[in-house]
C-alpha cells in the first residue's frame, strides 16, 4: 500500500505533517566460546558496515519518493556503524542546495576520514549495536532505523524493504504523525491518510512468520507493532558450527535459551 501518492487531499500551502517511522530489529545468535562471540561480532560488523547501510538507506529514500541532499556515515571502533541521510521531498536545483551538502556523491565521501552533516525535518538514520556478554552463550545485534519525513512522503512505503534487508528475530516498529496541515477551507488536518495498524502495511507472508501485537493510541496518532519469530531453526542460530555436532539434549537446551532471550527482548522485561 502506497501512501501520499494517490487520493491526495486538497491542501492550503505546504503539507506540514511530520511522519516518523522508528524501526528496530534484533538478531540473536548462539556463540558459546569467547572466540565464537568475537567472531560473530566481527562478522556482523563487516556484514552491516556503513557502506552497506548507506546503500540500504539510499534505496529507502528512493522508495518513499524523496531525494538525497547529504550523507553522513561512520564506522566505529571496536564495532558499530551509523549513517544519516538528509532528504528532500522535491528535486532541488543544485544552486538551491546548501554548499555543505554532498548530494551523496561517493567520491566526496571517500576523501574524508570522518563525515558529519546536519539533520532536517526529513531525514533517514541508522545505527547498529552488536552485543554479547562473556558469561552468556548468546550474542545479539540490533539495528535502529529512523525515517522522518515532512510533506506528502510517507516512510511506511519502505517498511517491507527494511524488514527484508535484515535477519530479524524480533522487530519493533513505531509510527507517529505530528503537527497539522490545513485544507483549502482552513480546517486543521492532524493526519492525511487512513491507518488502523502498522500490520496493514506489512506483507502477509512476512506476518505469517511472526507473532505480532499492536499497542496503538489513535487519538494521539501513535502506532506500535512488535513481532516475534515463530519458528526457531537451530542451524540458523549457530555460528561456525553444524547442528549435527551437538547432542540432541544440548540442542533442546540451546533452543530454550534462545527462545528465553527472544521473549525477554520482545517483552522488554527480565523474566527468567
Swiss-Prot record:
Q: Which domain of life is it from?
A: Bacteria
| Entry's EC annotation | 4.1.1.50
**Modification(s) after translation:** Is synthesized initially as an inactive proenzyme. Formation of the active enzyme involves a self-maturation process in which the active site pyruvoyl group is generated from an internal serine residue via an autocatalytic post-translational modification. Two non-identical subunits are generated from the proenzyme in this reaction, and the pyruvate is formed at the N-terminus of the alpha chain, which is derived from the carboxyl end of the proenzyme.
* Enzyme class, UniProt record, top EC level: lyase
Entry-annotated residues carrying Pyruvic acid (Ser): 122
* Keyword line: Autocatalytic cleavage, Decarboxylase, Lyase, Polyamine biosynthesis, Pyruvate, S-adenosyl-L-methionine, Schiff base, Spermidine biosynthesis, Zymogen
GO molecular function, one example?
Answer: adenosylmethionine decarboxylase activity
Q: What is its cofactor?
A: pyruvate
List the pathway annotation.
Amine and polyamine biosynthesis; S-adenosylmethioninamine biosynthesis; S-adenosylmethioninamine from S-adenosyl-L-methionine: step 1/1
Positions of the record's site feature: Cleavage (non-hydrolytic): 121-122
InterPro entries registered for this protein in UniProt: AdoMetDC_fam_prok (IPR003826), S-AdoMet_deCO2ase_bac (IPR009165), S-AdoMet_deCO2ase_core (IPR016067)
GO terms for biological process, alphabetical: spermidine biosynthetic process
Report the active site residues.
122, 127, 150
Renumbered to this chain, the signal peptide range is none
What GO cellular component entries does it have? cytosol
SUPFAM superfamilies for the chain: S-adenosylmethionine decarboxylase (SSF56276)
Q: What does this protein do?
A: Catalyzes the decarboxylation of S-adenosylmethionine to S-adenosylmethioninamine (dcAdoMet), the propylamine donor required for the synthesis of the polyamines spermine and spermidine from the diamine putrescine.
Q: Report quaternary structure and partners.
A: Heterooctamer of four alpha and four beta chains arranged as a tetramer of alpha/beta heterodimers.
The entry's family comment says: Belongs to the prokaryotic AdoMetDC family. Type 2 subfamily.
Q: What is this protein's record name? A: S-adenosylmethionine decarboxylase proenzyme
Q: Which organism is it from?
A: Clostridium botulinum (strain Eklund 17B / Type B)
Amino acid at each position: 500500500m502506497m501512501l501520499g501518492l494517490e487520493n491526495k487531499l486538497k491542501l492550503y500551502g505546504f503539507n506540514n505533517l511530520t511522519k516518523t517511522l522508528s524501526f528496530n530489529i534484533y538478531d540473536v545468535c548462539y556463540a558459546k566460546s569467547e572466540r565464537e562471540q568475537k567472531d560473530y561480532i566481527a562478522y556482523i560488523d563487516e556484514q552491516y558496515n556503513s557502506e552497506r547501510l548507506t546503500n540500504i538507506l539510499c534505496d529507502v529514500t528512493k522508495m518513499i519518493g524523496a531525494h538525497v541532499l547529504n550523507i553522513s556515515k561512520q564506522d566505529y571502533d571496536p564495532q558499530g556503524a551509523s549513517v544519516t541521510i538528509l532528504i528532500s521531498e522535491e528535486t532541488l536545483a543544485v544552486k538551491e542546495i546548501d554548499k555543505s551538502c554532498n548530494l551523496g556523491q561517493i567520491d566526496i565521501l571517500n576523501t574524508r576520514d570522518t563525515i558529519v552533516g546536519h539533520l532536517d525535518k526529513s531525514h533517514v538514520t541508522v545505527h547498529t549495536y552488536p552485543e554479547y556478554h562473556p558469561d552468556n552463550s548468546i550474542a545479539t545485534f540490533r539495528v535502529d532505523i529512523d525515517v522522518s519525513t515532512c510533506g506528502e512522503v510517507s516512510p511506511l512505503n519502505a517498511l517491507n524493504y527494511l524488514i527484508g534487508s535484515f535477519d530479524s528475530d524480533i522487530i519493533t516498529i513505531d509510527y507517529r504523525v505530528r503537527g497539522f496541515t490545513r485544507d483549502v477551507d482552513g480546517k486543521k488536518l492532524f493526519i492525511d491518510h487512513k491507518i488502523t495498524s502498522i500490520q496493514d502495511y506489512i506483507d502477509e507472508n512476512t506476518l505469517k512468520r511472526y507473532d505480532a501485537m499492536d499497542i496503538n493510541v489513535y487519538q494521539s496518532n501513535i502506532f506500535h507493532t512488535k513481532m516475534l519469530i515463530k519458528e526457531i531453526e537451530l542451524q540458523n542460530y549457530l555460528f561456525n558450527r553444524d547442528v549435527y555436532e551437538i547432542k540432541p539434549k544440548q540442542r533442546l537446551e540451546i533452543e530454550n535459551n534462545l527462545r528465553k532471550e527472544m521473549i525477554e527482548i520482545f517483552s522488554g522485561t527480565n523474566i527468567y
